[in-house]
Amino acid sequence: MTFVFREIQKEDYTSCADSLIAAYANEPWNNPWTLEEALLRIEATMSGFNARGYVIEYEGNIIAMCLGRIDYYFQNWRQFCIDEFNVTPHYQRQGIGRQLFAFAATQLKKEAIQQLFLLTGGAQAVTFYEKNGFLTSNEGTMMVYPLTEA
């Protein structure tokens, strides 16, 4: 198998949307994404000047992606917020995600990014990220303010 690691291109968005739909369709998420919703998420994530995206392509299809944005702070502190990271189910548990992290980290280091961060849910996802060197942060608290009634 020959995998191509590269930066995302606009032409990849539909293939990325297919990958996102497949990745979240089953346990533990069971999210019923439509193609339109998945495309909107990808387009919105990639719309800013600070957006970065990395993909793995195999036989013309995107099988994994890491999308996010650079956050800029004082004293030249830069971190990359991973907004979307997934591997198509058929390719999971084969080291593809680990390889994508390594590729993305190498690319981001070239831009003087000091750290990666993300928000995730579910024990399976937490275990995956911990195995790949992520640490649980106790800095801050995620808070939400509902704008609609439940």
Language-model regions, residue ranges each:
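A short beta-loop-alpha structural element at the N-terminal edge
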Residues: 2-18
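Conserved GNAT-fold acetyl-CoA-binding loop/helix
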Residues: 21-42
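A short helix-loop-beta-strand connector motif used in the catalytic cores of GNAT acetyltransferases and
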Residues: 43-55, 81
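Conserved beta-strand in the GNAT
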Residues: 55, 61-70, 86
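A conserved beta-turn-beta hairpin within the catalytic core of GNAT-like acetyltransferases
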Residues: 71-82, 92, 138-139
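Conserved acetyl-CoA-binding loop-helix of GNAT-fold acetyltransferases
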Residues: 87, 93-106, 131
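Conserved active-site alpha-helix within GNAT-family acetyltransferase domains
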Residues: 98, 121-139, 145
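Conserved GNAT acetyl-CoA-binding A-motif
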Residues: 101, 109-121
